[in-house]
């Protein structure tokens, strides 16, 4: 019987069960738990390779007569998902993941689950890593250029609010009122990015809130700059319960209308999505972080404080003054800014992520956050925590699968769950929309190799278009065919609430995109979130700002050196 070494097998077909991959220049190692492809029957495309007519490709079945034939197969790829780290072929049809297993020709190959046909295209995944597209639930739609910056970082869904560079958009993730919501839905219709908008959750009666939901808002945002009072929070949640949408909250830093206990009482056990729950981005000073222990709170971080480094505190003051329209010549404004920037709570934030207490990472784009760094900074936290805290339970020095799955969940499945869109996006599984990101391991988390939306390549590393092959320098991220023409109408999604779809908003506005409903939000608890659902008792000392979890002091050292940083951006 023929045999080959692991090294030779990995060079031809990619790694297999038991092999390990280092993720870029981090100290994290992913070990392949299972190989769903069949040894000796691997589907590989190219000259003299397997996927040829009569061999690995079936030559007589049509797409119409065989509903299992995919439009695209990604071969021999390492899937890195909250659900597992494994090797498989991925079949995609009509923009949906239809098969995860072994691809080939059922007439000539045994054990295949994904038939390759005449209508099938091949993307070579050998030696590469595949993740679900990232989801950022904290977007200030200030500049349309954010969309490309997010896309080339691996983000395929952006949820938030705004109207452009207005003062209130620079401060709050809110698209206020039906007219602005409709104009933004029209504006965003042609971009290769899934979109959901948040309306303004600030009213004294239900009607103005309901108007925004009927207009297309998939959530309401409550923000202190508009007045995050207990009454405002309570009313927004009451309306959200009626229409099955999310409420996102940035609480009252100044404690003008009440303290964290007042907000907890106003929430009243109802599910809510808290933004920058550590507090530097805003929220009850100094103890908003305590809400992360509540079973009904879905806590997120924004990326400026992730990970905690020697530069974190210093950069925040100027950033905060700009984002919240504060005046450095006014002592009260400076005091407001100072109250939000606390070394002790920032130092606890990374540890809370590592313990699975903080559940989601997001950007706060151009409003104290960097839209293209959600994924980078998530993995920088994971690396920093491994270096400081050692392996998670069940991991070893050479295998970090539990930590890796916990962290990938923070920007994929968990934000999808929080916004009621996990039935469509957020993970690599059959039946989900094929928003997928392909990575070379040496660039994992920092520079994707290829981004697919709805099964179509929308952006990729590409060399000089006038060259004889695709790879000559300069290799840059460039929009691909899926970003042009009317392709985005099928490869990108606008998420709407049920009531807006029933009211015919897509038809009224002439939207050409795929429309999907958000739902299942109001029954969520923190336990619904994958691998990040811990609910301990969290206490902040009101004088020292020290954070304790079930009585134990929680802190970490600021990082002086990070992976996924300068060496990847020299040119």
From Swiss-Prot:
GO terms for cellular component: cytoplasm. Carboxylation allows a single lysine to coordinate two nickel ions. Binds 2 nickel ions per subunit. Residues 133-571 form the Urease domain. The gene is ureC. This is Urease subunit alpha. Belongs to the metallo-dependent hydrolases superfamily. Urease alpha subunit family. Its cofactor is Ni cation. It comes from Corynebacterium efficiens (strain DSM 44549 / YS-314 / AJ 12310 / JCM 11189 / NBRC 100395).
